[in-house]
């Protein structure tokens, strides 16, 4: 499956100042796309866009604001929807915020994209959708029950994506990220991911803190591979749209 031609293509990246989003922005700019970013900068950082700032249009706004989404989608051919509250622990402490941002926000992005005649929306789902399924390897169609409000929100994103494809003809593709890590990932704060925490501890000459007996395993994805998945999804055949 080839990466589509992106030269001069008008695209939107929601959450484009964030960890994954900013790497995606860099890749799109490198390929000549005309990039617009929508980000409320609550977790995203302007410094993440330093390499591409002169070639990116930045709209500061929130995906919970439909009008902001409509302005951002205007004139775009392709949308990469990365904006979200991305922490399972945070969703357990504050489920309402995760649902509001991740579900209402995604519904707004999809509705704005539909109304602006955007061709395709590639959005970030999550491996958490597999829930309590013990099946290995993980396959689509073998999902279990969700284990957190965050997982519920991402499952609802997939349902919304499928609905908008079926009901309105808006092409959507969801990507179930597995524990993405890499540069620009914040090692600080109560919801920091394990890989940047390990690197941060090692940089300070400390031993990484491992809970349990150390026999547990997780699947990790380097951020450049997540970016490549987004680019490939942008060029996937239309018959594959409407599903994660």
Show the residue positions of the predicted features:
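Short, polar/charged, Gly/Pro-enriched helix-capping and turn/loop motifs at alpha-helix termini
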Residues: 105, 136, 187, 208-209, ...
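Short, charged helix-to-loop "capping" segments that act as catalytic/coupling loops
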Residues: 69, 187-191, 237-242
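Glycine-rich "substrate-gating" loop/helix at the edge of Rossmann-like oxidoreductase active sites
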Residues: 147, 178-192, 207, 212-224
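Alpha-helical substrate-binding/gating segment
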Residues: 180, 196-208, 220-244
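N-terminal Rossmann-like NAD(P)+-binding domain of SDR-like oxidoreductases, especially those catalyzing
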Residues: 1-180, 224, 230, 234
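Generic signature of intrinsically disordered, low-complexity, basic-rich segments
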Residues: 13, 120, 170, 188, ...
């Amino acid at each position: 499956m080839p990466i589509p031609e992106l030269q001069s293509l008008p695209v939107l990246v929601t959450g484009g100042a964030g960890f994954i989003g900013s790497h995606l922005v860099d890749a799109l700019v490198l390929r000549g796309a005309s990039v617009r970013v929508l980000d409320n900068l609550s977790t995203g950082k302007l410094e993440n866009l330093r390499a591409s700032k002169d070639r990116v249009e930045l709209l500061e706004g929130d995906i919970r604001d439909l009008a902001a989404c409509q302005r951002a989608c205007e004139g775009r051919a392709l949308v990469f929807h990365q904006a979200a509250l991305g922490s399972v622990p945070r969703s357990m402490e504050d489920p309402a915020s995760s649902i509001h941002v991740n579900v209402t926000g995604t519904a707004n992005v999809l509705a704005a994209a539909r109304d602006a005649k955007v061709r395709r929306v590639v959005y970030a789902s999550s491996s958490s959708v597999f829930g309590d399924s013990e099946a290995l390897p993980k396959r689509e169609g073998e999902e279990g029950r969700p284990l957190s409000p965050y997982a519920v929100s991402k499952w609802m994103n997939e349902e919304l994506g499928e609905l908008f494809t079926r009901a309105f003809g808006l092409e959507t593709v969801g990507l179930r990220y597995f524990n993405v890590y890499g540069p620009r990932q914040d090692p600080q704060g109560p919801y920091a991911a394990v890989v940047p925490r390990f690197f941060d501890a090692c940089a300070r000459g400390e031993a990484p803190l491992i809970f349990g007996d150390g026999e547990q395993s997780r699947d990790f994805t380097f951020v450049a591979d997540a970016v490549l998945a987004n680019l490939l999804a942008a060029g996937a055949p239309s018959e594959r749209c409407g599903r994660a």
